[in-house]
């Protein structure tokens, strides 16, 4: 089963499959990322404590 990352962006609850995530970086205690949103680049962020371990592994 594919891991999903749940996050809020501009007040809207969103969820993205971890396989669509392109780039991951740390900003303080937040993990920011970009993902493929049907051909467009989407952005998201999640707190480090709420991030799935698969997302944290992409930081390395």
Curated annotation (Swiss-Prot):
Subcellular location(s) per record: Cytoplasm
Picking any one GO molecular function of the record gives: DNA binding
Biased-composition ranges, Basic and acidic residues, are 46-60
Q: Which UniProt keywords apply?
A: Cytoplasm, DNA-binding
Q: How does activity depend on temperature?
A: Hyperthermostable.
Question: Per the record, what is one GO cellular component?
Answer: cytoplasm
- Coiled-coil annotation reads none
Chain intervals for the UniProt region annotation (Disordered): 37-60
Q: Does the keyword Cytoplasm apply?
A: yes
Q: Which domain of life is it from?
A: Archaea
What SUPFAM superfamilies does the annotation carry?
A: Chromo domain-like
Pfam families (alphabetical): 7kD_DNA_binding
Q: How does activity depend on pH?
A: Highly stable from pH 0 to pH 12.
Q: Which family does it belong to?
A: Belongs to the 7 kDa DNA-binding/endoribonuclease P2 family.
Function summary: Can constrain negative DNA supercoils. May be involved in maintaining the integrity of the genome at high temperature.
Instruction: Kindly give the NCBIfam families that the UniProt entry links to this protein.
Output: Sul7d
Q: How does it assemble?
A: Monomer.
Q: What name appears for this protein in its UniProt entry?
A: DNA-binding protein 7c
Q: Which organism is it from?
A: Acidianus hospitalis (strain W1)
